[in-house]
Amino acid sequence: NQQHSSGGFGYVAGNLPSGSMTCAGISSLIIVEENLGETLPVVNGRLQCCSPQDDSIALRRAIEFWGARFAARFNPTGPNDVGKHYLFFYLYGVERAGRLSGRRFFGDHDWYREGVDYLLQRQQPVSGAWVGASQIAEAQGEIATSFALLFLSKGRWPVVAAKYEYGTDRQWDQNPKGLHQLVRTTEKRWDQKLTWQTVNSRLASVNDLLQSPVLV
């Protein structure tokens, strides 16, 4: 009941959607679905783990909304999308939503590359810090820099595998949680931080595909 009719999320019900709150909504929906869906259905004595499955309607609407509104240079807020408030907090929210969903792209946007490009442009040349604009908290270099580093640091995690998204149905995603669980288990066995992603066949370049040792 907090989701806006557009699919995005505001700070409270009735607020216009913002980038930071929509990212928080996407991440929260994913976490809730993971915990609610621990037990897969059983039909005729067989576990139904490998059949096409859809994201929840709420999550799908939020991701579609976000794909059309994504920006790396400002926190899209309100009808004019001119928000500079909580920009670095917002970018960390983008990173969380991207990682938790395993999405390389939001809409047509390679969110990590666009975010990195912008952060490198905004870094202070002498101190190496980041400083936010027109917002008291992020005007403190320590806060803005912390969020920037949280965004950038995940880019150093090796991509161990990727899902190849194709077609208009969900045949490519027979077991939505399978790769996520496999990577999580491998992390523990190897004692190393790893990540995975979904690459869209329409948007991904050859270099994008070559980043993943395994493509499923």
What are these regions (language model features)?
Residues N1-D117, Q121-V160, R170-Q174:
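An alpha-helical repeat/solenoid feature that recognizes helix-turn-helix modules
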Residues R156-V214:
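Aromatic-Pro/Gly-enriched surface loop or interdomain linker
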